[in-house]
Amino acid sequence: MIITTSRKPSQRTRSLVNDLARVFNFKILNRGKIPLSELIENKDDMIIVEELKGNPGRLKIFNFENNKILSMNLSLKLQREVSGKAFKNSGKLGSKFDKNTEHLKEFFFEYLFKKLSNYKEENFEVVITFKTVDESTFYIEVHKGSENMGPSLKIKTVKILDIE
């Protein structure tokens, strides 16, 4: 899976892309002047980190099998802000949803987890946790054992969009 940014990303957006690439073992595409239409034509599964007011503000996960996009508005803390270090996941990755985020499990499996070669339903070393803040907000965090490794994403809205 490829991860990239909107054009002319800020340093904070590039840092988030690097953090996510290290955790999920994504390939980073330095977008440069590549138009979005060209990225979509390739039909490679991808994630685009978009900016709002100069900061990473939206994550779009493209699913070309269903011709849909999982779009999430977010705020975040980078790995260096959460754990003080850059964490590279070289092991198996799993997920854990609390009772209030359980309904999101199928979306994240369909759009993200089933496309990862290192994702396992059990016997994993690193866990992506989904936990509720309130009825409209939840966190996605990366844990190894009991330690939060970062990044920590606070998701405010989740929408399913059509790829046009």
Swiss-Prot record:
Q: Which InterPro entries match?
A: Brix, Brix_dom_Rbsml_bgen_prot
Q: Which Gene3D superfamilies match?
A: Probable brix-domain ribosomal biogenesis protein (3.40.50.10480)
- The answer to keyword Secreted applying to this record is no
Question: What's the protein called, per UniProt?
Answer: Probable Brix domain-containing ribosomal biogenesis protein
Might you name a Gene Ontology BP term for this protein? rRNA processing
Under PROSITE patterns, the record lists:
BRIX
Arranged from A to Z, the UniProt key words for this protein are: Ribosome biogenesis
Q: Please explain the role this protein plays, according to its UniProt record.
A: Probably involved in the biogenesis of the ribosome.
Please indicate which superkingdom the organism of origin belongs to: Archaea
- Protein source organism: Methanococcus maripaludis (strain DSM 14266 / JCM 13030 / NBRC 101832 / S2 / LL)
Keyword hit for Transmembrane: no
What sequence ranges are listed for the domain Brix? 1-164
Care to name a GO molecular-function term for this sequence?
Answer: rRNA binding
